[in-house]
């Protein structure tokens, strides 16, 4: 079975390393299976990097089953438009598209780990603001709201959410309103939005500490968590 592990794409070297590590962990998990299926994991992107998901899907054998799995945290334009277009145009006889990685309680626990690394403790008690890229689609925004609810459950404290893109509620406006000591980063890896989130937090003039993205190449365990979510989505 061909598995198209499809991420957004980034110019960030650190971000690329993190996504590559996720794919490595996916391969490791699939190699451990005893179901008699040969899984071949291929890289693909919806933006910035190559090969595009359209080109990657078109290059696969038409008579072999394929699943496109988004390495994306939420439903959105990419999952509902880009991936579906690639699947239709591929000519592959048996092709399906998996759901996005989140929302998922495992990702919320990983976000808590990143907050703890930034200095957050349960005794802190104050509101946390979670920043996410944002989506033009209502279902994508609902996913991000649910992700904030899951983080609130993982932390045992109030979590507000805001979007880094020009979509309401905007992250910097939520930070300015709630004045959190810590901000959680609901992004998979370093890249454009992670940098903008830090700049937006700084622009408020408030001392909010911004946690790192969920995965980095120096922490294979974080990539393993995401890979487990990936395989679960693939199996659904």
Predicted regions and their residues:
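Active-site-proximal alpha-helix that buttresses catalytic centers in soluble enzyme cores
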Residues: 1-236
């Amino acid at each position: 079975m061909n598995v198209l592990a499809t991420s957004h794409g980034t110019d960030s070297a650190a971000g690329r390393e993190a996504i590559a590590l996720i794919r490595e962990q996916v391969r490791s998990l699939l190699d451990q299976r005893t179901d008699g299926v040969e899984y071949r994991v291929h890289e693909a992107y919806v933006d910035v990097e190559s090969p595009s998901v359209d080109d990657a899907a078109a290059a696969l054998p038409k008579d072999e089953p394929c699943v496109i799995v988004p390495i994306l945290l939420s439903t959105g334009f990419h999952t509902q438009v880009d991936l579906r277009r690639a699947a239709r145009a591929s000519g592959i006889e048996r092709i399906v598209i998996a759901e996005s990685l989140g929302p998922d309680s495992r990702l919320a626990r990983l976000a808590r780990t990143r907050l703890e690394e930034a200095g957050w403790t349960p005794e802190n008690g104050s509101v946390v603001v979670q920043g996410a890229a944002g989506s033009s689609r209502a279902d994508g925004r609902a996913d991000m709201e649910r992700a904030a609810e899951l983080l609130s459950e993982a932390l045992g404290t109030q979590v507000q959410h805001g979007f880094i893109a020009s979509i309401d509620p905007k992250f910097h406006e939520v930070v300015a309103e709630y004045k959190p000591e810590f901000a959680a980063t609901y992004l998979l890896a370093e890249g454009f939005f992670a940098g903008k989130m830090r700049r937006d937090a700084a622009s408020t003039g408030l001392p909010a500490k911004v946690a790192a993205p969920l995965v980095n190449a120096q922490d294979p365990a974080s990539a393993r968590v995401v890979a487990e979510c990936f395989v679960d989505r693939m199996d659904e």
